[in-house]
From Swiss-Prot:
Segments annotated as CHCR repeats: 607-796
Subunit-level organization: Homooligomer. Component of the homotypic fusion and vacuole protein sorting (HOPS) complex composed of the class C Vps core proteins VPS11, VCL1, VPS18 and VPS33, which in HOPS further associates with VPS39 and VPS41. Interacts directly with VPS11. Binds to RABG3B.
Similarity comment: Belongs to the VAM6/VPS39 family.
Phenotype upon loss of function: Defective embryo arrested at cotyledon stage. Heterozygous mutants produce some yellowish seeds with developmentally retarded or abnormally shaped embryos. Conditional dexamethasone (DEX)-inducible mutants exhibit altered vacuolar morphology showing fragmented round vacuoles.
Lipid bilayer topology: Peripheral membrane protein
This protein's name: Vacuolar sorting protein 39
This protein's record includes keyword DNA repair: no
Source organism: Arabidopsis thaliana (Mouse-ear cress)
GO biological processes: autophagy; protein transport; vacuole organization; vesicle-mediated transport
């Protein structure tokens, strides 16, 4: 630890008088002697050295100033900024330099024993007996007394501390406030050694207590817990950064002024009387000789310390190198940190070693060269260190040359499997773990800057590509690795190559130390890990979660999804380990695909087919929540999974039916119809088809036909069988506004008056059924016509069905026979006469929609005698929906032989309602007439009003006379205003209201 910070040189010897004080002025040396004389020494005249510094050569006597002082000179100090020499003898005197003429003598300082000079302000303080005096230099040759203070005891040591003064008196240290003269105690001084106050360049103080130096600020507050400890109690201390030099009874000690304040050098000299700081050295005054301590250059000291292994002291000295040598300082610090790091690493202080590697800013590959178990990209040039520690251990199963080694060779290696070396293996494992943990901390600290630089470099490259300045589309010099995503690192990219080295090494270190979770978090963020190396390591260690994140971070989605599918299959067949079966499931594929819906929908569709059967609901939810085009999904499902197409469309309709296009609605209804047709074909083959039976497939189709509005009914109608699915046909015809045909099916084919009534109610209540110019109650009249004239309705049914293209015209005869031969429901059925002349039916309707026409509209008489009227259904309809049917039109449709008492349930409420409405209208008419009379009467009263205008009448708004101007009168009949003023005021109110409304 000890080295030579100073070289001791005897400047003069054999002085004829005892030397009590020494000082330097430029290259000259002043020696104040016991006899009061001042001897001036200088280097030989032949010396050509710098005249402003002391020289390392024997000085010769230049001049003796006899009688310089009447008494022995106690102390001297050169005030270089003012070209003055201060001397303390019987009093304090100031002499001009270089001629030493007396400038001023402070007579009040007679008997002074200590002083302190503040060069910045030109203030002098000194102690005399129990007084402290302060004088100020007036800038010329005089001094002005500022103030005189009283103190409790004789002052042994004194020093300025800012604008206050620190005093070391007999028993304690105190701070004297020069503004008000108050004293503040600091702490007691030592019992044996006298007080010692030393000022530091920073303005702080060192206060001596026996052999300990205590650091305090300018207010006397303790600064730190550390203390500087000397071998003995010093009598004087000189500060020369970065050292503190203390004068001890038999030697001079040099200590580093930095915790823990180690001893640097000891210089043994006898009879030392004075220790004085010079501009470039430290002067040591003996009885009859003078030694000078010349500082060794900082660079030489650093070399000494580094060679001896004192790296911390060497680094501390680097801090004090001159600012103009910043490059040299950085180089030295880096070199020392590197050597120190190697030393610490070899001695087992791995974390501390990494701190110094970090401070040295050495290349990452230099540190990684000490870890042969870490595999790096092949393009990396690895430096060979002087000494490398093999920290591979059992965890580091991969090394730079191990990828081709067989299992047999590994198992035959005695390094791992010799039973006699179990303890050595345990120590090796512990060492490996500790070294890798230290490496992880080092890499994590280096990583942010490296990643930021790599990212910015990548951004600049993208911008350059965009503007076409750097990389052309056919640039053959641009070589890249054949990988994807962030793993794609150009070989000429220094920052990204370094990032790849760092992340690859960091990932391996995390895995070797069992930190799989941290490795996964690393891969989730921005990383530049080498894909090939990391994939091999992760596959070998079966760390599939990290491997998936590696693929994901490098946009290798195909590889990731294949791996997930493989793991899911293994978990099903129980071929993998228990933990794998618990972690990996088909749902993970869905979770992986979710973020890809926006960027790569075709990839999502491709791999979703792997889990569609095992997780249908989650997969379809993926399609719906991923904002993938519904048409694209439907087309893909139709081609690759037609059995799931309907389920997808169902869920989509359930989520938001308004967002489903008409094409998809058509698809869904067609799928439902296909299912029902398949069911119909199967049951018809077994002769088990029942038109009244409603299995789930048929219920689903009917519900879709009724609730969905965007499908095209015409193609569906053509797919229906001729002699089945009548209810579906009725719903489809209703969607085509062929209400008469739909009702004919309900009445004649299904024999379901209740369904016909429900159909009418649905149409009546629907806002879509509002034919132009005709009331919505026509739908009930339509069903009445069907009930009252089944022959005609059957004939129209056959004609219009053929016109719609639902059947071939050759089938209409059979269809009409089927209609007319049907029996009514519930015992009311009667034989309906067969329709004659069906072969004469002509195809042709001018309109494809049913306008809801009735016989009343066309004034066609009912055909009687050939058909049986369904009178009971008619009467039920009239009694149940009397309020929705036009009574007059309904009565016209009824047969003449209808009994009046059968119409009572219809006519009674109808007449009551009509009478009540008539009475209500009469009351309303009377009220309106009365209100009209009241308004007329009030108008008459207002017109009878009289306003008296005289020559003195004033306008209430402008306060001017009305005169002959047009005027207005307010409703109270008294307030008169000009009509112009009234109009303007109303306009202002209107503007105000408009503005207020806009603000709100």
């Amino acid at each position: 630890m000890v080295h030579n910070a100073y070289d001791s040189f005897q400047l003069l010897k054999d002085c004829p008088a005892r030397i009590d004080a020494v000082e330097s002025y430029g290259s000259k040396l002043f020696a104040g002697c016991y006899d009061g004389s001042l001897r001036i020494y200088s280097p030989p005249e032949s010396s050509a050295s710098d005249p402003s510094e002391l020289h390392q050569e024997t000085y010769v006597l230049e001049k003796t100033v006899a009688g310089f002082s009447k008494k022995p000179i106690v102390a001297m100090e050169v005030l270089a900024s003012r070209e003055l020499l201060l001397s303390l003898s019987e009093s304090i005197a100031f002499h001009g330099l270089p001629n030493l003429e007396t400038v001023a003598v402070i007579t009040k300082a007679k008997g002074a024993n200590a002083y302190s000079w503040d060069d910045r302000r030109g203030f002098l303080c000194f102690s005399r007996q129990k007084r402290v005096c302060v004088f100020k230099h007036d800038g010329g040759g005089g001094f002005v007394e500022v103030r005189d203070y009283g103190v409790p005891d004789t002052v042994k040591s004194i020093s300025w501390c800012g604008e206050n003064i620190c005093l070391g008196i007999k028993k304690e240290y105190v701070i004297l406030n020069t503004a008000n003269g108050t004293l503040s105690e600091v702490f007691p001084s030592g019992r044996v050694a006298p007080p010692l106050v030393i000022s530091l360049p920073s303005g702080e103080l060192i206060l001596g207590k026996e052999n300990i130096g205590v650091f305090v600020d300018q207010n006397g507050k303790l600064l730190q817990t550390e203390r500087i400890c000397w071998s003995e109690a010093p009598t004087s201390i000189v500060i020369q950064n970065p050292y503190a030099i203390a004068l001890l009874p038999r030697r001079v000690e040099v200590r580093l002024l930095r915790s823990p304040y180690p001893l640097i050098q000891t210089i043994v000299l006898q009879n030392i009387r004075r220790l004085v700081k010079s501009n470039n050295a430290v002067i040591v005054g003996l009885d009859n000789s003078v030694y000078v301590l010349f500082p060794v250059s900082i660079g030489a000291q650093i070399v000494q310390l580094t060679a001896s292994g004192n790296f911390e002291e060497a680094l501390a000295l680097c801090k004090v190198l001159p600012p103009d040598e910043s490059s040299l300082r950085a180089a030295k610090e880096s070199s020392i940190h590197t050597r120190f790091a190697h030393y610490l690493f070899e001695n087992g202080s791995y974390e501390e070693a990494m701190e110094h590697f970090l401070a040295s800013q050495v290349d990452i590959t230099h540190v990684l060269s000490m870890y042969p178990s870490i595999i790096l990209p092949k393009t990396t040039i690895i430096p060979q260190p002087d000494k490398m520690v093999d920290i591979s251990g059992d965890e580091a199963s991969l090394s730079r040359g191990s990828s081709g080694i067989s299992d047999d060779m590994e198992s035959s290696s005695p390094r791992y499997f010799l039973e006699s070396e179990d303890n050595a293996d345990l120590e090796s494992k512990k060492m490996s773990h500790n070294t890798l943990m230290a490496l992880i901390k080092y890499l994590l600290k280096r990583r942010p800057a490296v990643i930021e630089k790599a990212t910015s470099e990548g951004t600049e490259e993208v911008i350059s590509d965009a503007v076409g300045k750097t990389y052309g589309a056919n640039d053959s010099s641009k070589s890249k690795k054949s990988s994807k995503g962030r793993g794609m690192i150009p070989l000429n990219s220094g920052a990204r190559e370094m990032a790849a080295i760092l992340d690859t090494a960091l990932l391996q270190a995390l895995l070797h130390t069992g930190q799989s979770g941290a490795a996964i978090e690393l891969l989730k963020g921005v990383n530049y890990s080498d894909v090939k190396i990391c994939e091999e390591i992760l596959m070998k260690s079966k760390n599939y979660s990290a491997l998936l994140e590696l693929f994901k971070s490098n946009s290798m989605h195909h590889e990731a999804l294949k791996l997930l599918n493989q793991l899911a299959d293994e978990s099903k067949t129980n071929q993998s380990q228990t933990d794998v079966t618990q972690i990996f499931s088909p749902e993970l594929i869905i979770e992986y695909l979710k973020p890809l819906c926006r960027t790569d929908p075709m990839l999502v569709l491709e791999y979703s087919m792997l889990v569609l059967e095992s997780c249908p609901t989650q997969t379809i939810d993926l399609f719906l929540s991923g904002n993938i085009s519904a048409d694209l999904v439907n087309s893909y499902l139709k081609q690759h999974a037609p059995n799931m197409q309907g389920r997808y469309l169902e869920l989509m309709m359930a989520m938001n039916d308004t967002a489903v296009s008409g094409n998809l609605q058509n698809e869904m209804v067609q799928i439902y119809l296909s299912e029902v047709l398949d069911l119909y074909a199967a049951k018809s083959a077994q002769q088990k088809w029942d038109e009244k039976d409603h299995p789930p497939e048929r219920k689903k189709l009917l519900s879709a036909l009724e609730s969905i509005s965007g499908y095209s009914p015409q193609p569906l109608l053509k797919r229906l069988p001729r002699d089945a699915l009548y209810e579906e046909r009725a719903v489809i015809l209703g969607k085509m506004n062929q209400h008469e045909l739909a009702l004919s099916i309900y009445v004649h084919k299904l024999h379901a008056p209740d369904l016909a009534l429900a159909y009418c109610d649905r149409i009546y209540e629907s806002v879509t059924y509002l034919p132009s110019g005709k009331p919505s109650s026509n739908i009930y009249l339509t069903v009445l016509q069907i009930y009252l004239n089944p022959k005609k309705s059957a004939k129209d049914f056959a004609k219009r069905i053929v016109a719609l293209g639902s059947f071939e015209s050759s089938d209409t005869t059979k269809m009409m026979d089927s209609v007319l031969s049907s029996k009514a429901k519930g015992g009311r059925s009667k034989k309906i006469v067969a329709i004659e002349g069906a072969e004469d039916m002509r195809v042709g309707l001018s309109s494809s929609t049913d306008s809801g026409r009735s016989d009343v509209d066309t004034e066609e008489p009912l055909e009687e005698g050939d058909s049986t009227v369904m009178i009971s259904e008619v009467l039920d309809l009239l009694s149940q929906r009397w309020e929705r049917i036009n009574g007059a039109q309904a009565l016209k449709l009824l047969p003449r032989e209808t009994k009046l008492h059968n119409l009572l349930p219809f006519l009674a409420p109808l007449l009551r309602n009509s009478s009540e409405a008539h009475r209500n209208f009469s009351v309303i008419k009377s009220l309106r007439q009365s209100e009209n009379l009241q308004v007329k009467e009030e108008l008459y009263k207002h017109r009878k009003g009289v306003a008296q205008v005289t020559s003195e009448s004033m306008c209430s708004l402008c306060n001017k006379k009305i005169g002959t101007s047009v005027f207005a009168v307010y409703p109270n009949g008294k307030t008169l205003v000009h009509f112009v003023c009234f109009r303007d005021s109303q306009g202002m109110k209107a503007v105000s209201k408009t503005t207020h409304g806009r603000r709100r």
